[in-house]
């Protein structure tokens, strides 16, 4: 069964190519803009807040609504771990990622009684072009896994019937970078 993947960038394409499901599913890659860092929260403008936070958050809400209207049984929202740890010069991006994770929990509570699961997957910041030399590390230790980490397997499982008992959760899939 096909999985509808919304969002742009390399990660969304990797997920379109690799994620499959045995039930109607949607994957929402949050449009976190890691290309534009903000030197200081004090310098953040209304236009930047609108472009980096508000518009992408509206797209997450719309994608969740579309998935619900399409009777998706599994919904997965993908964010960077930067939201969980914060990131110097990436405050609006971190706020967007955390807002999306809170929305996941709320949707899971609302829709769970109808058999819909809603979860988040937090991946390495590089998938969103977030520069760790600017944001600072998300951990005080190096990653525990040395291979390149793909979230395809975790997201495929969350889109399956086998994951029916997991909802409202964030699964970290970053090779042990954020613990």
Show where each model-derived region lies.
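Short, well-ordered coil/turn residues at beta-beta hairpins
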Residues: 29-35, 174
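Structural motif
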Residues: 25-27, 74
């Amino acid at each position: 069964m096909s999985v509808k993947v919304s969002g742009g960038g390399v990660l969304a394409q990797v997920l379109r190519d690799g994620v499959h499901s045995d039930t109607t599913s949607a994957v929402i890659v949050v449009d976190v803009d890691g290309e534009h860092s903000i030197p200081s929260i004090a310098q953040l403008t209304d236009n930047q807040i609108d472009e980096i936070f508000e518009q992408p958050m509206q797209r997450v809400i719309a994608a969740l609504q579309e998935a619900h209207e399409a009777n998706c049984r599994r919904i997965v929202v993908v964010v960077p771990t930067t939201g969980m740890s914060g990131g110097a010069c990436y405050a609006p991006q971190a706020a967007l990622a955390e807002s999306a994770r809170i929305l996941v929990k709320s949707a899971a509570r609302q829709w769970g009684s109808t058999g819909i699961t809603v979860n988040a997957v937090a991946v390495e910041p590089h998938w969103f072009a977030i520069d760790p030399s600017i944001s600072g590390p998300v951990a005080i230790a190096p990653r525990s896994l040395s291979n390149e980490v793909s979230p395809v397997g975790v997201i495929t499982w969350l889109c399956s019937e086998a994951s029916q008992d997991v909802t409202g959760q964030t699964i970290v899939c970053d090779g042990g970078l954020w613990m």
